[in-house]
């Protein structure tokens, strides 16, 4: 996990990038009251980060959950640090030491390569669940910058803690669009190579031209599109910390479900409307699903395929949940489920 140490390495990289002025960090940072250094020792997961360092935005798509282990140092004046994280497809381990100060909860780290000393503060922690660190540094290119990091004893934290972290970060001048959550790719062993992702082929029907308002709502499908490839992925909130309601295709339930999108990055399994999601990702297997109105109380007339009757029928959709057996016109239902005897041409099947 990107540790205090990895954080400091990240901050030092700001020296190599030129950008505009950044907000000035506060002069006086308050540490956790009655800080107990022995209780901060042990393993932590770095789950979120925010920074005024301009370079940070350039690598946000590559930042993943990392681990940090803190412990007693080689001398009474130090604490030891070991961080483990994925970097460029390889599991990397970094070790170092932090210097204690006269203020409990404040530590110094010297980066000899850049000849700078960084100040790190433990500003909030309950020791058993979470910890928030702030780190200040000064570079000749950007002047003073500040970085906030959220750590957890487990790979997941309560949503309220993520919200509290965002408030703390913004309170020291970090812009909202510079606060990110980390993608969790799991823990790794130093030297381990990250496996290549495996895409599972799926089968769906070709669609009618746009003017026919077919299942795809677009041109005749003759090749696999990047968006359709993404239908096999799980949803991704992305590293930013916004809360925008979006839809993703759940291949297990064969339905489009809602999730909270952070506002940046993520992946292609991300749709503004349920209709767009279904018309992009639904497969012919949806025609065999039961007709489900859903628990909400709206009254929306949609079409579904009745497998018993062998035809498309109207049904009142409640407005939420349901499943993929849900079409926005009779023509869409018929062309998708291949209703015989309608004079329609047989629809082609293909796999990606």
Curated annotation (Swiss-Prot):
Site (Inhibitory (P1) (trypsin)): 297-298
One CC-aspect GO term: endoplasmic reticulum
The keyword DNA damage belongs to this UniProt entry's keyword annotation: no
Consequence when changing residue 53 to S: Impairs the reductase activity toward cytochrome c independently of the electron donnor. Decreases the reductase activity toward methemoglobin. Decreases the reductase activity toward oxidized collagen
Pfam families registered for this protein in UniProt: Kunitz_BPTI, Lipocalin
EC nos: 1.6.2.-
CDD domains on file: Kunitz_bikunin_1-like, Kunitz_bikunin_2-like, lipocalin_A1M-like
Residues that coordinate or bind 3-hydroxy-L-kynurenine: 53, 111, 137, 149
Full protein name: Protein AMBP
UniProt source species: Homo sapiens (Human)
């Amino acid at each position: 996990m990107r540790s205090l140490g990895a954080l400091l390495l990240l901050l030092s990289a700001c020296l190599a990038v030129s950008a505009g002025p950044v907000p000035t960090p506060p002069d006086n940072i308050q540490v956790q009251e009655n800080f107990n250094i022995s209780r901060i020792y042990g393993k932590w997961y770095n789950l979120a980060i925010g920074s005024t360092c301009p370079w940070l935005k350039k690598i946000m798509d590559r930042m993943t959950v990392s681990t940090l282990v803190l412990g007693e140092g080689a001398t009474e004046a130090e604490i030891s640090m070991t961080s483990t994280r994925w970097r460029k497809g390889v599991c990397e381990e970094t070790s170092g030491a932090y210097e204690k100060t006269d203020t409990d909860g404040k530590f110094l780290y010297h980066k000899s390569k850049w000849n700078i000393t960084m100040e790190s503060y433990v500003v909030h922690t309950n020791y058993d669940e979470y910890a928030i660190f702030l780190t200040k540094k000064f570079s000749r290119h950007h002047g003073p910058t500040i970085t906030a990091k959220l750590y957890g004893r487990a790979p997941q934290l309560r949503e309220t803690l993520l919200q509290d972290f965002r408030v703390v970060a913004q309170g020291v001048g970090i812009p909202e669009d510079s606060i990110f959550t980390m993608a969790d790719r799991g823990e790794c062993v130093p030297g381990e190579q990250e496996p290549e992702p495996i895409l599972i082929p799926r089968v769906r029907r070709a669609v009618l031209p746009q003017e026919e308002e077919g299942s795809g709502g677009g041109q005749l499908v003759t090749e696999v599109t990047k968006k359709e490839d993404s239908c096999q992925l799980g949803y991704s909130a992305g590293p930013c910390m916004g809360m925008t309601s979006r839809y993703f295709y759940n291949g297990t339930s064969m339905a489009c479900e809602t999730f909270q999108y952070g506002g940046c990055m993520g992946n292609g399994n991300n749709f503004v409307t349920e209709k767009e999601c279904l018309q992009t990702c639904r497969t012919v297997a949806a025609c065999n699903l039961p007709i489900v109105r859903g628990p909400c109380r709206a009254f929306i007339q949609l079409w579904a395929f009745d497998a018993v009757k062998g035809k498309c029928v109207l049904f009142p959709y409640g407005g939420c949940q349901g499943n993929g057996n849900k079409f926005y016109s009779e023509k869409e239902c018929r062309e998708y489920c291949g209703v015989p005897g309608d004079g329609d041409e047989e629809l082609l099947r293909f796999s990606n």
